[in-house]
Amino acid sequence: MEAEAGGLEELTDEEMAALGKEELVRRLRREEAARLAALVQRGRLMQEVNRQLQGHLGEIRELKQLNRRLQAENRELRDLCCFLDSERQRGRRAARQWQLFGTQASRAVREDLGGCWQKLAELEGRQEELLRENLALKELCLALGEEWGPRGGPSGAGGSGAGPAPELALPPCGPRDLGDGSSSTGSVGSPDQLPLACSPDD
């Protein structure tokens, strides 16, 4: 039984001679069937290994393609980051320039505005001065008009009866609107050159 349990390669020549022909054929066929089964199992294992290798090779090819695509995207993103960084630097420089320009412009505007306010104050002071001068001149003209007005009329109760010469009568103070260019003062000069009765010494 122990010899039957082992293979033919484990039997000695005496044990094989002691066995019958039929037993040897039976053991040989059994070992051949076992070897065929092992070969079939090995073939199946090889097929499974080949299938797994093909799957792994396909995954490797897909990973290579994905790696190439990711590398291309990485290059694009790196270029985009470089471009955005340069644009950011350019924007910061432009912002600093605009800030400097705004500071200088606001300073210039404040200076111009201060000058304008100063000029406006000077003009207002000059305007008030001119208004006072105009009021004084107007009062002077009214006073002169009241002083010289009665002399151009008829004489009073103790007078000579004849009024002064027409050229002695002074026109009102200020420029006179000539209208058509005629003059009623008897002046021999140009119609535009009219005397002003603004001072008794005239």
Curated annotation (Swiss-Prot):
The keyword Cytoplasm applies. GO terms for molecular function: delta-catenin binding. InterPro entries: CCDC85 (IPR019359). Keywords: Acetylation, Cell junction, Coiled coil, Cytoplasm, Cytoskeleton, Differentiation, Growth regulation, Host-virus interaction, Nucleus, Repressor, Transcription, Transcription regulation. Induction: Up-regulated by doxorubicin. One of its GO terms (cellular component) is adherens junction. Pfam families: CCDC85. Its main location: nucleus. Widely expressed including liver. Residues 180-190 have a biased composition (Low complexity). GO terms for biological process: cell differentiation; negative regulation of cell growth; negative regulation of DNA-templated transcription; negative regulation of fat cell differentiation. The modification N-acetylmethionine is found at residue 1. It is found in: Nucleus; Cytoplasm, Cytoskeleton, Microtubule organizing center, Centrosome; Cell junction, Adherens junction. Functions as a transcriptional repressor. May inhibit the activity of CTNNB1 in a TP53-dependent manner and thus regulate cell growth. May function in adipocyte differentiation, negatively regulating mitotic clonal expansion. Plays a role in cell-cell adhesion and epithelium development through its interaction with proteins of the beta-catenin family. May be the cellular homolog of HDAG. Overexpression inhibited HDV replication, whereas overexpression of HDAG reversed the inhibition, suggesting that HDAG may assist HDV replication by forming a complex with DIPA. Belongs to the CCDC85 family. Interacts with CEBPB. Interacts with EURL. May interact with CEBPD. Interacts with MCRS1. Interacts with TCF7L2; competes with CTNNB1. Interacts with ANKRD26. Interacts with the beta-catenin family proteins ARVCF, CTNND1, CTNND2 and PKP4. This is Coiled-coil domain-containing protein 85B. It comes from Homo sapiens (Human).
